[in-house]
Amino acid sequence: CALPIYIFQKKLNTFNKIFRPKVTVENLLTMTSGVTFNESGIVSGNDWLTSYLNSSITGTPGENFQYNSLNTYVLSAIVTERTGQSLTEYLEPRLFAPLGITRYFWETCPKGITKGGWGLFLCTEDMAKLGQLYLQKGKWNDQQIIPEFWVEVSTAKHKESIEGTFGYGYQLWMEARPGSFEFNGMLGQNVIVYPDMNMVVVTNAGNNELFQNCVMLNIIRKHFPRNFHPADILPENPCSQTLLNRLTAELENGIHAPQTLPALRKGGWKKNPPGLRRSTNTRPNTWNYVKGLPAPNPYQFTQQLNGKVFELSPQSIGLFPLFIQIFHNNMTEGVQKISFTCEKGNFSVNFLESGEWHNIPTGFGKFKESWLTLHEESYLIAASGEFTTDENGTAVLKLDFTFLEECVRRKINIFFLPEDEILIRWYETPGKGMIMEGLESITEEISNNFLYGAFKGTGGLELLHRVMEQTIEPVSHGYLVTPAEVAPEQRSVSFLNESDCGELSAEPSETTTTSYSAESL
């Protein structure tokens, strides 16, 4: 592992061949290369390996821990250079097949090299298999898949870490409990191994956290502290099992309290003071609250929305969260129109983007699954809706779009205003907090730059922050433009189950895939 990376000498420019400090495989494994080309640089070019090899180095390789997923990418590139196979091809007969992992996908860079440090899609059960393999010292069904010595050396602490608090091994994080370690993927994807308790814990949370310092992992540490030593196997507990089954059923079926809304009339929403009734003849294009009429249920509301189309302004906000656009290099042009359809009890929210209508079947009190395709890339999503009102009595449709094979989600709140208008607030997870934190880290790195100082002195930094916040959580307006008979095309929607439009269990199952950062492979 201490051998310098000479196999890529041909990719170095003349200056770096002479003066660049040598980076070793050990440096890559322990995140101590010091190479400055990192995840943020991949959007600027297609040859990541050459950019990495010719970028500057801070300090001396091997001294300081600095997490950089491109270190793992270079490890993947080394496998390809030495074997002539991609990392995925190399692992298929040696790891995936013996463990029975058949449903996986690993993204590649523009040059065809497996990304290594991210972009691996695995089922939750298969994530657990990796932890169990390490728990068993690399052995699976009496076959030694990974050398035992490698399991031991890779799970030992080699460096004190910055983001984590317990140290770093070879592509693995140490955990709080002595002897425990963790496969840590960003946004709440983790495999935690407790050898002394013979236990593996897998999480698939989709939160805003990048590393080990997060609420979710602190909860796990709270229940499995250093001094916790479990007794023998617990006896069966039918009462607890019944409660668990009930909770699971509630999550799967999306049990919620009945929703009530103000009455909807043609033209828009109107909030009249109690006791007042306004004739619809005085303002024919306004939906009014009407005293004495019963509040409609969601079905009635969706029927009245059926066929309505709104043109949006601005039209630069994409249906895809920024996270997906950047990491998949699938940039969107922005939603131009939004419409609603309700046919045979099936409600859909439809978005016109890139000249194509995208229909999203939406459940109330439950999720519905469908495929969303943009630029020939398909994404499995689950959508649910909720009708409510804000503090001013304005009717609101809250939409929750979960990208099931990603760790992101898009949330959209649509406010129905008078005069046939809507206001839309767009949110995403990971959201403003994490993205703004990333912006802070970038500005810290360039804080000594003269131009940066001048920019900051003129208030430019505050302006940049405001622009970023408006980009992450934008607001758009919509105006009613077309009658009910103009319906969007249906070709872009695919129900997974035509009988129930693919009702979604709230708990990821073995048939649900997820994107997982798997540096340890």
Region roles according to the model:
Residues 185-285:
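Structured C-terminal helix/loop/strand segments within mature extracytoplasmic catalytic/sensor domains
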Residues 56-61, 71-73, 109-116, 176-177:
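Flexible glycine/proline-enriched surface loops and loop-helix/loop-strand junctions
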Residues 239-521:
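Peripheral terminal and inter-domain segments
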Residues 1-4, 28, 52, 65-96, ...:
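Alpha-helical scaffold elements that line and support the substrate/ligand-binding pocket
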Residues 1-33, 54, 85-118, 122:
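Active-site helix/loop module of the DD-peptidase/beta-lactamase fold
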